[in-house]
Amino acid sequence: MSSWAITGASRGIGFEFAKQLSADGSNQVFALIRSEPSAELAELSSGRENLHVIQADVTDAQGLSEAAAKVGELTGNKLDVFISNACHPGLDLRFHPTSAFLGKEKELKEEIDACMNVNLLGAINSINCFLPLIRNGELKKIIYITSPSGDAEFTRKCGVTVTVGYSITKAAMNLVMSKYAAELKGEGIKTLSLSPGWVDTDGTRDMAPTPEILEMALQVFQKFKPDLTGLMSVEESVRMQLNVINGLTVKQSGLALSHHGDYNWL
């Protein structure tokens, strides 16, 4: 039996992790959500005794501690894998390039703060709260769901100028995961920043709400991967991500890798 906890599990990639992992009845799966569960998560959990839904807003340190305590009560105070998936895509000005914030310094701070509170500080606080359980687990893995947007080479090659707050907080958390790897290596704990690819989720559709914008995004990403044809299904992405997680080695700990297990971000 393996135990898994996933933040941001109400929909999208987080929900799919909970769905695929709980399909194996020998797994204990904890879907951590900010508020009320989505209809699909509520329906799924009602039919799976090994899937537990727990409220845990990653911006609320006290709530995270309470959620970790609830998980510990059900697992014997241990956890095998923690997946930090909750994220914030940015505010109304997320499609502004950096230089466009001249004269909009207040809006720039708001943009960065909104992303930082979830993507960086929220991730750190959630990992710290669940770390005592990971220390007692058998698999001892901490996974952060990152993005190609947090990679400098991807940004340079594709010419991505927007989503400033989202991108820099993802990049910052990639480094934090390397810090965790260095700190926890002696305890046998492995960490990984894992990019899911370009995935067909509500979040992606919000970022590209029209067919025209989606086509523009495809053309940008084809600069990195010329044979890219479109969005990947969330089911396929999570299957590939789980393969990377299950095969995570000590040598890979602290790296940022794609769903392919390499640096092919798309």
Swiss-Prot record:
InterPro entries: NAD(P)-bd_dom_sf, SDR_enzymes, SDR_fam
Pfam family, one: adh_short
Keywords: NADP, Oxidoreductase
Keyword NADP found: yes
Single GO MF descriptor: oxidoreductase activity, acting on the CH-OH group of donors, NAD or NADP as acceptor
Job of this protein: Short-chain dehydrogenase/reductase; part of the gene cluster that mediates the biosynthesis of the meroterpenoids arthripenoids. The pathway begins with the HR-PKS atnH that catalyzes two chain-extension steps to form a reduced triketide, which then primes the SAT domain in the NR-PKS atnG to initiate three more cycles of extension to give a linear hexaketide corresponding to the polyketide part of arthripenoids.
Protein name: Short-chain dehydrogenase/reductase atnB
Annotated source species: Arthrinium sp
Encoding gene per record: atnB
